């Protein structure tokens, strides 16, 4: 299928046919501050999600790259100042050197915060994975992306979705020739529930570990078109090495 039909997930839903936006369809409003590692990437507006992995580092999708980013932590309703937020500018934004904008392979970047986040009950880091994602494992996906599979409705409050990791065979069958070893699928082959525009870069967490980053898909919540996610396990060494080199 022509790559121009891919709806990838960067949140500025300008009318580009190759649009990197991503959303939660068929989910529910997260309990307030129940996803303390979730961040909003802001450049005057929310455009992507991300995950806090240490006091001073955030991981997101490579396609979410912008030269200037403010990281917003402790958010629930992104349109209201609720008193728990921390707004910290990015000091460094480091995209994976082998990121491919055409195939979205190596769709990962790191953000160093200009000052460490204050860790508390509303803002805390998520652990990196110690094993690759296993088929059938329940996962939590979260974000402020579009909640409609057709049309647009961007929520103010953080949305959550519980969904299973699919087998690599199911993933590859859904997108023949498009799935690399650095990608995996999460969701429901029958459709109806998925991430979508605006969720890009956000977390997929299983058993308390960050297994995935919202990356791409064909449409949102479509039958036999599950969401595709960056396999964080493959990048643990790169993450650790990059942090060490930029401390």
Curated annotation (Swiss-Prot):
Propeptide residues, chain positions: 16-23
Main location: secreted
Top-rank lineage group of the source organism: Eukaryota
Record note on modification: Sulfated on tyrosine.
Modified residues (Sulfotyrosine): 154
Catalytic residue positions: 63 (charge relay system), 107 (charge relay system), 200 (charge relay system)
Cofactor: Ca(2+)
Residues marked Required for specificity (site): 194
Subcellular location: Secreted, Extracellular space
Residues binding Ca(2+): 75, 77, 80, 85
Disulphide bridges, residue numbers: 30-160, 48-64, 171-185, 196-220
Keywords per UniProt: Calcium, Digestion, Disulfide bond, Hydrolase, Metal-binding, Protease, Secreted, Serine protease, Signal, Sulfation, Zymogen
Reaction catalysed by this enzyme: Preferential cleavage: Arg-|-Xaa, Lys-|-Xaa
Pfam family, one: Trypsin
Annotated ranges, domain Peptidase S1: 24-244
Gene Ontology biological-process annotations: antimicrobial humoral response; collagen catabolic process; digestion; extracellular matrix disassembly; positive regulation of cell adhesion; positive regulation of cell growth; proteolysis
UniProt remark on cofactor binding: Binds 1 Ca(2+) ion per subunit.
Tissue spec: Expressed in Paneth cells, at the base of small intestinal crypts.
Function: In the ileum, may be involved in defensin processing, including DEFA5.
Family designation: Belongs to the peptidase S1 family.
Name of protein: Trypsin-2
Originating gene: PRSS2
